């Protein structure tokens, strides 16, 4: 992957961690974010306009929450702006992708492959066109779920229960 360009659609906390990993692989990282962070700039992330992101990315990662402006943003019009053979990774929100358009692009070879941890309807429907698309890997919204991540959640839960039982509840939202 060295020398390739990783494009981030969204560069908040998760996007910054993704950028660090991409840079460790020798990739150049560009991003589109309506609110570019200084932390990302300090890491060397180059912020670009949306059309530049689509045109320059060898790998495009979706890393932002679902909003009106990005619902269906991965569609045939924007896929046409992308490099032939682009790789698309979505572990953000399934509704950001027009699934039939992505399936068509995968089957034609315009998109080389896609790694999707989310789809528009979960659990995935049997008639989802991505299930029959070439070079498409779909996981059940579990990309965060490494063994160490699950262990941290269990440890935090135990500590929160202990604190509650000791009369010192943590992370109270209705004080």
Task: Report the location of each language-model feature.
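Residue-level preference for short coil/turn positions at secondary-structure junctions
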Residues: 1-2, 55-56, 84, 132, ...
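Short alpha-helical functional segments enriched in proximate histidine and acidic residues
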Residues: 21, 56, 160-164
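Conserved SAM-binding motif I beta-strand of class I
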Residues: 31
């Amino acid at each position: 992957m060295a020398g390739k360009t990783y494009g981030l659609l969204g560069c908040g906390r998760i996007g910054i961690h993704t950028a660090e990993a991409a840079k460790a692989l020798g990739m150049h990282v560009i991003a589109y974010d309506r609110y570019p962070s200084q932390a990302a700039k300090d890491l060397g992330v180059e912020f670009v306009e949306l059309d530049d992101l689509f045109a320059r990315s060898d790998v495009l990662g979706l890393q932002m929450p679902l909003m009106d402006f990005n619902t269906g943003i991965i569609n045939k019009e924007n896929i046409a702006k992308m490099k032939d053979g682009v790789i698309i990774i979505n572990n953000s929100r399934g509704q950001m992708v027009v699934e039939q358009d992505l399936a068509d692009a995968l089957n034609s070879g315009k998109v080389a492959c896609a790694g999707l941890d989310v789809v528009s309807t979960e659990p995935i429907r049997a008639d989802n066109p991505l299930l029959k698309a070439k070079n498409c890997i779909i996981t059940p919204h579990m990309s965060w779920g490494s063994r160490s991540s699950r262990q941290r959640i269990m440890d935090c839960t135990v500590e929160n229960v202990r604190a509650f039982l000791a009369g010192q509840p943590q992370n109270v939202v209705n004080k």
